[in-house]
């Protein structure tokens, strides 16, 4: 009974948060991290991009599965999750040396944001 009461109290008192706006918060990154993210990592990933899949709620980007690209994707995701917290970000590596996939999805409106903000990725 005490556990049930605790669960009910927890559910009632847990604050709900509003969704963040569809805007890149560049201030979430330090000046050095911002330069690295936008001026180095993003262009490097665009150059390595093999394919793009359009999804109903976002996009998937295919990359070669080499270690250097995996490291770039990982570092890019670390920055992107801070400046664009409204993204659902998934990294998937196919078995047997298959492709590396970066998936950006989210709530309604995210796909349109990606189309506008990632125009240089040639969606």
Map each language-model feature to its residues.
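Short beta-strand-to-loop capping motifs
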Residues: 62-67, 102-106
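Short proline/glycine- and acidic-rich turn/helix-capping motifs at secondary-structure junctions
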Residues: 90-101
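Positively charged n-region of N-terminal signal peptides that target proteins for export
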Residues: 1-4
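Amphipathic, hydrophobic secondary-structure cores in small proteins
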Residues: 76-77, 86-92
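N-terminal signal peptide c-region/cleavage motif recognized by signal peptidases
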Residues: 13-14
